């Protein structure tokens, strides 16, 4: 039995599967998985990540003429996503950390689950800007210049924020747990 291609879009919000702007639907559907991954790196929460990714796509939809004509539409979309993430955290002022990780499969040994939990806990302890720089560098694999464009700052600021974030992560008790030597 051949699967219906629409089944693959089940996780994609309806707003991005109805093309209101020429090319928006294809653009949004192709970027959806990466947006959710990036938002998850910023939030550590799967459901919040999907909400933020939807918000980013909704804002991109409204500004589709500008986004589609931008030199780098992906950078434009990343900036929308990062701004939406920062707005969400400012609005919520999260004081309680989620206790459970989402039930996503992990390839590899069971100890990777513990390492992943420790990394997410350590990332949650970073200030939002440092967490954003770490996620954009190591999860999205962006250069200093691309991160600077996304955050609206200089590459030097990106490097200093990255350096501070890495120093804090090295000192993090969450990442120190489980070290056997």
Predicted regions and their residues:
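A short, charge-rich alpha-helical start-of-domain segment used by transcription regulators
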Residues: 2-3, 7, 12-37, 47-50
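Internal acidic/polar
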Residues: 5-9, 87, 94-121, 143, ...
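Conserved RNAP core-binding helix
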Residues: 36, 46-63
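Structural recognition of an alpha-helix C-terminal capping motif at a helix-to-coil junction
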Residues: 51-58, 71-83
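Arg/Lys-rich amphipathic alpha helix in sigma70-family domain 2
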Residues: 62-69, 79-99, 112, 171
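DNA-recognition helix of helix-turn-helix
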Residues: 82, 86, 151-175
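Helix-turn-helix DNA-binding module
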Residues: 124, 128, 140-157, 168
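A short pre-motif secondary-structure segment
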Residues: 133-137
């Amino acid at each position: 039995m051949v699967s219906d291609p629409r089944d693959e879009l089940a996780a994609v919000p309806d707003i991005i599967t109805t093309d209101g702007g020429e090319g928006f639907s294809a653009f949004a559907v192709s970027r959806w998985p990466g947006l959710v991954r990036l938002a998850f790196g910023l939030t550590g929460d799967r459901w919040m990540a999907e909400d933020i990714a939807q918000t980013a796509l909704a804002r991109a939809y409204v500004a589709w003429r500008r986004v589609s004509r931008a030199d780098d539409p992906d950078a434009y979309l990343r900036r929308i996503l990062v701004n939406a993430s920062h707005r969400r955290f400012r609005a919520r002022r999260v004081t309680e950390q989620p206790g459970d990780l989402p039930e996503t499969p992990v390839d590899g040994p069971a100890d990777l689950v513990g390492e992943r939990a420790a990394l997410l806990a350590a990332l949650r302890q970073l200030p939002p800007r440092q967490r954003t720089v770490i996620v954009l560098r190591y999860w999205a694999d962006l250069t200093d210049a691309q991160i600077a464009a996304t955050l609206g700052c200089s590459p030097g600021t990106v490097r200093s924020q990255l350096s501070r974030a890495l120093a804090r992560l090295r000192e993090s008790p969450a990442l120190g747990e489980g070290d056997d030597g």
